[in-house]
Amino acid sequence: MAKNIKDIANQYAKAIFELAGEQDNVDEVLTDLRTIKTVLDENQNFITIASSADVAIASRDDLLKTLTGNSTDSVKNLVKLLQVNNRLNILSIVVDEFVSQYNEVNGIVDVQATTAVALDDGRLDKLASVFASKTGAQQVNIENVVDESILGGVILQSQSTLIDGSLQTKIAKMKAQLLG
């Protein structure tokens, strides 16, 4: 049975996470991978060029050495392994999977707070505290997204939890009760 790309990326991420744990440099590997992801996000054609058969092998190797720069040996080896296996196209997904594993192990949760108006940092910090107390998260990284269609209130959403306190949902529930 063929595996999907996310499963394959997860295997690479799990392997480098375990290796980093054994070498006691998980935080350093995380920093290196995030730096690489930033470079890839800012240079959309990087992987295409670094994988192209039209580009000389030495030039592709130089590109990858530039990408990994001062990274740990395990990160350099990961990128080289992906290149050898013709899987450079999943490097960003591998980074995302590594970050997910790191966050899970460290009790870190990424939360999207959807509100009708932008919130200041103080209110976002309070929402993060509420979310942490309700879910048991050690740390909450909160991002505010403005969506005027929710009318008011807030929707807090992580990968596994949804807390919908939006005015739009409350109105819809009242309407259903009145009509039901």
Curated annotation (Swiss-Prot):
Keywords (A to Z) from UniProt: ATP synthesis, Cell membrane, CF(1), Hydrogen ion transport, Ion transport, Membrane, Transport
InterPro entries: ATP_synth_OSCP/delta_N_sf (IPR026015), ATPase_OSCP/dsu (IPR000711)
A GO MF label: proton-transporting ATP synthase activity, rotational mechanism
GO cellular component: plasma membrane; proton-transporting ATP synthase complex
Subcellular location: Cell membrane
Membrane topology term: Peripheral membrane protein
Short name of one Pfam family: OSCP
Main localization (coarse): membrane
Family: Belongs to the ATPase delta chain family.
Summary of the function given for this chain in its UniProt record: F(1)F(0) ATP synthase produces ATP from ADP in the presence of a proton or sodium gradient. F-type ATPases consist of two structural domains, F(1) containing the extramembraneous catalytic core and F(0) containing the membrane proton channel, linked together by a central stalk and a peripheral stalk. During catalysis, ATP synthesis in the catalytic domain of F(1) is coupled via a rotary mechanism of the central stalk subunits to proton translocation. This protein is part of the stalk that links CF(0) to CF(1). It either transmits conformational changes from CF(0) to CF(1) or is implicated in proton conduction.
Subunit structure: F-type ATPases have 2 components, F(1) - the catalytic core - and F(0) - the membrane proton channel. F(1) has five subunits: alpha(3), beta(3), gamma(1), delta(1), epsilon(1). F(0) has three main subunits: a(1), b(2) and c(10-14). The alpha and beta chains form an alternating ring which encloses part of the gamma chain. F(1) is attached to F(0) by a central stalk formed by the gamma and epsilon chains, while a peripheral stalk is formed by the delta and b chains.
Protein's name in the database: ATP synthase subunit delta
Top-level taxonomy: Bacteria, Bacillati, Bacillota, Bacilli, Lactobacillales
This protein's encoding gene: atpH
